[in-house]
Amino acid sequence: MPIRYIDQLKDLKGKKVFIRVDFNVPQDEKGNITEDTRIAGAVPTIKYAVEQGAKVVLASHLGRPKGEKKSKYTMAPAAKRLSQLLGKKVMQAPDCFGPDVSKIIDSMKPGDVVMLENVRFYPGEEKNDPEFAQQLVNGCEIYVNDAFAVSHRAHASVEAITKLVPTIAAGFLMKNEMTFFDKAMSNPVRPLVAILGGAKVSGKLEVLETLVNKVDKIVIGGGMAFTFLKAMGYGVGKSLVEDELIPTAKKIMDKAKKKGVTFYLPVDCVVANAFEANATNFVTTVQEIPEGWMALDIGPASATLFAETLRDAKTVIWNGPMGVFEMDAFCRGTFAVAEAVGNCYATTVIGGGDTDAAVNKAGVAAKVSYISTGGGAFLELLEGKILPGVKALDVKK
């Protein structure tokens, strides 16, 4: 799919450039940003547009205000943080369209940056309403999507707007996301190893069915592993199991065997008598999980086994933690895998949310080839889907 990037556009000077960013970042109760990776990730694109003399109009969502104006979801803290990262003032608009916003945009000078208010303050955003998209355009001549993490959503500021602006392009963050994903999945150096974790098989069913056709090894950890272990006949106590997916788990393992894909599951785990941070816990083999106990992390032998699978890997994709890593008693498996991924001699791509947080907590983020900003978007790419926000950038359409 041919996509044009912002550095391929001619003469941005004096032009109004609408950049869709994803500043949906965590904040504390006082509205202070606690983690700014997504804001920092968009800086190269914004900086480039500023240096080229564009009048930069930024749009993003924050949280789920459900189509209503709610002060706790204002973009003002993001604009303030961006000002610090850019080293220049970022104006905060009072809304995302309307006379007051038009007045600000019309008075902008080359190199100025304005942050529109939360686009999800209006129901038209999530409905992909073309009329709402038209209001967002506000005289902008160029549209740039640098919001990979929301590009799996066909929303007005991601999809509908691309039909209303003469020139469309992708930003540098989007380019990095697509380049590394393509390197890892479309044209990987093999062996290609996929590590999947997280709570439920149901959330990654399509991913698993796609990966079985593409990878050389699959490593399964986290709560989802216990549906597979039960499918193999193990008693798993009170561990999380999706009984209705046991037949599907069997089919996936059978398919992996037929395709010559090596399938790794935990051999031991940390079990607890309750889903609590201070619960009584101990390590046991997966064959000996006591009745009434639940597995909340992989054990040390599993961590060693999983690390061994990466020794000859040339490409590694990881999505999902190995246990309830937010609780100190059940974080060791995730951190051990993070260290193994960080230390392996391969192209390593980390996908989304919890995995990103785990890699940062483990202190190995700098050793990873690429950390994706997208959770749901990354998973949909793994499923083999074309993201609506990416499809909308197709210059041939």
Swiss-Prot record:
**Where would you find this protein in the cell?**
Cytoplasm
* Residues annotated as binding ATP: 204, 326, 352-355
Recite the UniProt keywords alphabetically: ATP-binding, Cytoplasm, Glycolysis, Kinase, Nucleotide-binding, Transferase
* SUPFAM superfamilies named among the record's database cross-references: Phosphoglycerate kinase
Cellular component terms (Gene Ontology): cytosol
Q: Which GO BP terms apply?
A: gluconeogenesis; glycolytic process
Pathway listed for it is: Carbohydrate degradation; glycolysis; pyruvate from D-glyceraldehyde 3-phosphate: step 2/5
Where do the annotations place substrate binding? 22-24, 38, 61-64, 120, 153
Q: Which reaction does it catalyse?
A: (2R)-3-phosphoglycerate + ATP = (2R)-3-phospho-glyceroyl phosphate + ADP
- Name the enzyme's class: transferase
Where mainly located? cytoplasm
Q: CDD domains per the record?
A: Phosphoglycerate_kinase (cd00318)
Provide a Gene Ontology MF annotation, just one: phosphoglycerate kinase activity
Q: How does this polypeptide assemble, per the annotation? A: Monomer.
UniProt record similarity statement: Belongs to the phosphoglycerate kinase family.
Q: What is this protein called?
A: Phosphoglycerate kinase
Biological source species: Trichlorobacter lovleyi (strain ATCC BAA-1151 / DSM 17278 / SZ) (Geobacter lovleyi)
Source organism lineage? Bacteria, Pseudomonadati, Thermodesulfobacteriota, Desulfuromonadia, Geobacterales
